[in-house]
Design a protein with these regions (language model features):
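Contiguous, well-ordered beta-strand patches that form the walls/edges
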Residues: 38-46, 63-160, 165-180
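Bacterial Sec-dependent N-terminal signal peptides
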Residues: 6-30
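Sec-dependent signal peptide recognition
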Residues: 1-2
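Short, intrinsically disordered, charge-biased short linear motifs at domain edges
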Residues: 21-22, 56-58, 111-112
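Short, solvent-exposed coil/turn segments at beta-strand boundaries
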Residues: 30-32, 50-59, 154-163
Length: 185
């Protein structure tokens, strides 16, 4: 079983009066901002995640690297999610944990070098990957999920760290995780 905690470092929420976006208050305010998790090992690869949360919208970018130095980009997965909403408070310790839901609007992959582009041939049922070109994976039975799928997750914020039950793009569609994990595996 893949256990995941995304311990991401971010900035604190602020009033986005420059863009006219409303200020989010309450528990969702703690999620606002940009969260980064730098150069971690995932399934034999190394990656960097960036989550940008603004209002009820989430954008994700996960760049995979060829080496542990995280300098040679291999490919990138990007997603956009909306309708972020707060569910139940499931606090069992001293830090508040909340259930959240969000809906996928776009999701895809971009190979970033020739070797990766060639290695993707046939992956996800797609034979014509193009280097530096985004490929939509929504409604792809092999590598994606249906558009407007709602994901179920949990989160807590401790200091400047965001903890999730599962990564944004890998959360369950059928049941909430029982807790925001303390390890990222």
């Amino acid at each position: 079983v893949l256990m995941s905690l995304v311990a991401l470092y971010g900035c604190s929420p602020d009033d986005d009066t420059a863009t006219g976006s409303p200020l989010i208050t309450g528990p969702l305010a703690a999620l606002q901002g940009t969260w980064k998790y730098h150069c971690y090992a995932e399934s034999g690869k190394h990656a960097e995640i960036i989550y940008k949360i603004s209002g009820t919208h989430i954008s994700t970018s996960k760049v995979y690297y060829q080496h542990s130095s995280c300098t040679d980009e291999s490919y990138k997965e990007e997603g956009a999610y909306s309708d972020l909403s707060l569910g139940d408070n499931i606090t069992s310790g001293k830090f508040s944990e909340y259930q959240i839901t969000y809906t996928v609007g776009s999701y895809g992959r971009t190979p970033l070098d020739n070797a990766t582009t060639n290695s993707f041939a046939g992956e996800c049922g797609i034979s014509d990957w193009t280097e530096n070109s985004y490929t939509n994976l929504l409604d792809n039975d092999d590598c994606g999920f249906p558009k407007n799928t709602t994901f179920l997750n949990v989160y807590k914020v401790i200091g400047n760290n965001l903890y999730l039950g599962d990564p944004i793009d890998a959360a369950s569609r059928t049941a909430f995780p029982t807790e925001a994990k303390s390890n990222f595996i």
